[in-house]
Amino acid sequence: MADGKAGSLTGKVALVTGGSRGIGAGIVRRLAVEGASVAFTYSSSEEKARQLVREIESEGGQVSAFKADSGVVSDLESAVRQTAETLGPLDIFVSNAGILSLGTIDTYRLEDFDRMVNINVRAAFVGVQAAARSMNNGGRIIVIGSNTAIRTAFPGGTVYTLTKAALTGLVRGAAIDLAPRAITVNNVQPGPTLTEMTSDHVDLVKPLIPLKRMGDVSEIASLVTYLASRDAGFITGASVTIDGGYVA
């Protein structure tokens, strides 16, 4: 940003949903470092959103934050519209917002099921659809899924696994639909990643990972940035797992 060097995404406009903390914030930071003008949504972490905006702007980046509930169609569509009005037509869209609600299938409440599907699947579809409608040809769409789409690694994760597996189908279909416009659509499937939400579980999870460590947010962001770049123009419809061999 401020060092004067052109990054791999200089001149591009990106929108990241759920970008105020964790993996989402790491993606926002990395896209900005690579020269993109970045907008992101947040639902409740307003102070974290403001901090991230100040951080990126202090380093010379261009960033905007929009409050949006990913479960509300009009909020997502408004975020896409506001991004275009503020920064320009979209080149990159990252669907990152998601929730986790655990419960075994014999006890899981239907209300929780509906909310998980609404946020993790329906919102991803709505976001991809809205972004594609306003996106420049040759754009990039990246959905953040989970390695649980491959294997349910813990009891109570049935519905979460279901929602993340659904994203693999969404990406394959959207990749075909948008190929005539040279828009690529891919799915990044992180495994155990060190964030504020997972820090309490490191000692439990780390021994189960062949590389014997948690993933770093910066590693997820690096993969997303590559898929958003010109170099990844022939990759589409793919689900790429990044989990240190956890589901190998």
Model region roles, listed by residue range:
Residues 2-5, 151, 204, 225, ...:
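Short C-terminal tail/terminal secondary-structure segment
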Residues 13, 20-21:
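Conserved glycine-rich cofactor-binding loop
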Residues 34-51:
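Conserved glycine-rich Rossmann-like NAD(P)H-binding loop of the short-chain dehydrogenase/reductase
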Residues 104-105, 109-114, 205:
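Substrate-binding pocket helix/loop in short-chain dehydrogenase/reductase
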Residues 128, 163, 171:
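Active-site helix of classical SDR
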Residues 133, 176-177, 233:
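Alpha-helical segment proximal to the catalytic Tyr-Lys
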Residues 179, 184, 235-237:
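Short, small/polar-rich loop/turn modules that mediate ligand/substrate recognition or access, typified
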